[in-house]
């Protein structure tokens, strides 16, 4: 199936894939060739792309997915390939954002730090899956 992932500033990914695992607002969903038409909201999390026997992990920051006629279009706020994420840095940024949330004295500050925390949590999860995958099948939602 053809997969096209679009960020606000560019097309991030446009390739064929055999399987997708999408982080939806109600949990992970698997997409294979000839999937029934579907429009779904996407949550922050790890998007898995299988091409042959190789999995690629992407840190997805919300958006929408449209599945129709052998094509998957994903429009997202942001996305990053797990192979480009520094795990230790992402873990530190997540910890800092979480601490800042608890110390925030305004609703706006709390929400800004919550968004940072959610972003870094998705990046940490993607980086861990990339690091631990070493040829095996992914385990999503942990």
Swiss-Prot record:
One of its GO terms (molecular function) is proton-transporting ATP synthase activity, rotational mechanism. GO terms for cellular component: chloroplast thylakoid membrane; proton-transporting ATP synthase complex. Keywords: ATP synthesis, CF(1), Chloroplast, Hydrogen ion transport, Ion transport, Membrane, Plastid, Thylakoid, Transport. InterPro entries: ATP_synth_F1_dsu/esu, ATP_synth_F1_dsu/esu_N, ATPsynth_dsu/esu_N. It comes from the Eukaryota. The keyword Acyltransferase does not apply. Its main location: plastid. It holds the Pfam family ATP-synt_DE_N. It is found in: Plastid, Chloroplast thylakoid membrane. It is a peripheral membrane protein. CDD domains: F1-ATPase_delta (cd12152). PANTHER family: ATP SYNTHASE DELTA/EPSILON CHAIN, ATP SYNTHASE EPSILON CHAIN, CHLOROPLASTIC. F-type ATPases have 2 components, CF(1) - the catalytic core - and CF(0) - the membrane proton channel. CF(1) has five subunits: alpha(3), beta(3), gamma(1), delta(1), epsilon(1). CF(0) has three main subunits: a, b and c. Produces ATP from ADP in the presence of a proton gradient across the membrane. Belongs to the ATPase epsilon chain family. This is ATP synthase epsilon chain, chloroplastic. The lineage of its organism: Eukaryota, Viridiplantae, Chlorophyta, Mamiellophyceae, Mamiellales.
């Amino acid at each position: 199936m053809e997969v096209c992932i679009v960020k606000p500033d560019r097309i991030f990914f446009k390739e064929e894939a055999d399987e997708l695992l999408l982080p939806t607002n109600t949990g992970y969903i698997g997409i294979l060739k000839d999937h029934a038409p579907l429009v779904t909201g996407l949550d922050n999390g790890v998007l898995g792309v299988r091409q042959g026997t190789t999995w690629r992990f992407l840190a997805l920051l919300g958006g929408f997915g449209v599945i129709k006629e052998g094509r998957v279009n994903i429009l997202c706020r942001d996305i990053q390939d797990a192979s480009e994420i520094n795990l230790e840095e992402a873990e530190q940024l997540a910890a800092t954002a979480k601490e800042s949330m608890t110390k925030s004295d305004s609703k706006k500050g709390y929400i800004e730090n919550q968004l940072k925390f959610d972003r870094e949590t998705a990046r940490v999860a993607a980086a861990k899956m990339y690091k631990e995958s070493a040829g095996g099948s992914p385990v999503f939602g942990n």
